[in-house]
């Protein structure tokens, strides 16, 4: 597998609408204020988090069960700044909608700005022919409240092109998170 460059990413956006909306260069300032950067980089794409968050809470004292997940575990917020409680977790989603080509696997890594503050972002790989908004998982590993900024950079996606086409794509096996819109909770 080969990591793909900014030139390839731009071409895939033009030919296949791989990322919508798409920022053709790194954006670091908005309305004369510094922001956490987003947009095209040399070998990846820094995506933004929307203002839609689901924050874990212990108000209802339920157990987190991935096979039988209860929305009572979460509080919904639409905010420009999401505060994650100490040692807690929040879900968000990208502003960008992705359509992954059949010969590509996408890996997500966190942004150093957040990582250096103890905020870790996790996303499982975007598989061949998957499409949708990406649900982002933010962990606050600190003993203090932590802030996530909506409409700013949250993570970087790296595009790996395979030497051969897979036999079965995510779309063909009817993956459960196909064409997800909004923050999507665990499905079994």
Curated annotation (Swiss-Prot):
SUPFAM superfamilies assigned: dUTPase-like
GO MF, one annotated term: nucleotide binding
This protein's UniProt keywords: Hydrolase, Nucleotide metabolism, Nucleotide-binding
GO annotation, biological process: dUMP biosynthetic process; dUTP biosynthetic process
Catalytic site: 137
Pathway: Pyrimidine metabolism; dUMP biosynthesis; dUMP from dCTP (dUTP route): step 1/2
Enzymatic class: hydrolase
Family of the protein in this entry: Belongs to the dCTP deaminase family.
Assembly notes: Homotrimer.
Protein name, entry field: dCTP deaminase
Species whose genome carries this gene: Rickettsia typhi (strain ATCC VR-144 / Wilmington)
